[in-house]
């Protein structure tokens, strides 16, 4: 089992999209790479905590490779948009790939480099080691499964 943490704007839609991928064993939404301890949703929306809304993905690399998972992730974000995805604006909505295993870095950078060839604008999706992670409040977990008509900036159908 491998882990990767992905930020692609509002984490509700990102989690729903990723949870539907064959080989993804589990997902959980949370806050990553910020400046404080134990942030709340209100903190990340109203204070300068610099956390990103993220989805922690556990996947079976015998079913889906990191390269394949990232290829799917790139399709749901605008990697050239800084701190904005859809109607959501703020540093918490930045795009990012946060790796747990340093051995994943080369594959991530290769994926980003390959994608850059199809964009004239610079890709601003950050690639960093996972520095910290806090699970989001329970009402955010599997939000769109619990609230099928809830807000989502990603086209899921």
Curated annotation (Swiss-Prot):
The active site is at 10. It comes from the Bacteria. It catalyses: L-methionyl-[protein] + [thioredoxin]-disulfide + H2O = L-methionyl-(S)-S-oxide-[protein] + [thioredoxin]-dithiol; [thioredoxin]-disulfide + L-methionine + H2O = L-methionine (S)-S-oxide + [thioredoxin]-dithiol. Its EC number is 1.8.4.11. Keywords: Oxidoreductase. Pfam families: PMSR. Belongs to the MsrA Met sulfoxide reductase family. PANTHER family: MITOCHONDRIAL PEPTIDE METHIONINE SULFOXIDE REDUCTASE. This is Peptide methionine sulfoxide reductase MsrA. It comes from Clostridium perfringens (strain SM101 / Type A). The gene is msrA.
